[in-house]
Amino acid sequence: MNKRNIENTRNALLQAAEKLMTEYDDPSKITARMLTKEAGVNLAMINYCFGSRESLLFEVFDKLQAEAMNSSPAFRKILEDDTSPKEKLVEIYFHSMKLMLDNYNLVRSVTKYVLMNRELSAKRGSLKFIQAHFKERKTESECRLIAYELASLHELAVLRHEEIKNVCGIDLKNDDELRYYIRKHIDMYLD
């Protein structure tokens, strides 16, 4: 298969996954057969192009999340103003977690996949703010690990938000409590 055909197949699968993810509340119900039928491609092409169904769904979710966050004027304003890197991280995680909590059925299975399969070397949007905060007091590797740990911690909290509410009394669906939770963890990592 030539490079152009692979790219066309990849794009068809991404479009099919995006369409199905907006139609279904639970991505775990979206089968590989449904995806390839919608895309009009061979079943084996999901693994060939993405490695797995979950990886395909994650790529679509990541794109949708970035579009949603970038379309928020309040979020864009925070990233562009002179707020400290630490405060920008609070807002990044606040908007990201809020979006995930508001779309919990959509993100549940994708987030489980991400937690178990994301590579430590994966580019994290928070990395540049962590590096700016530490101003060379920590190496890039140390900052990358902090970005990975913060992202994983917050993604796990989204998955376990009901138990966190029941056991710890912190309602992550409440904006003030969500900000408190995020700020507490960022303060622990960004000493």
How should each PLM-predicted stretch be described?
Residues 1-25, 29, 34-38, 55:
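Basic, helix-initiating cap at the start of DNA-binding domains
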Residues 73-106, 140, 147:
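Hydrophobic alpha-helical connector segments
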Residues 94-118, 161-163:
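Amphipathic alpha-helical segments used for helix-helix packing
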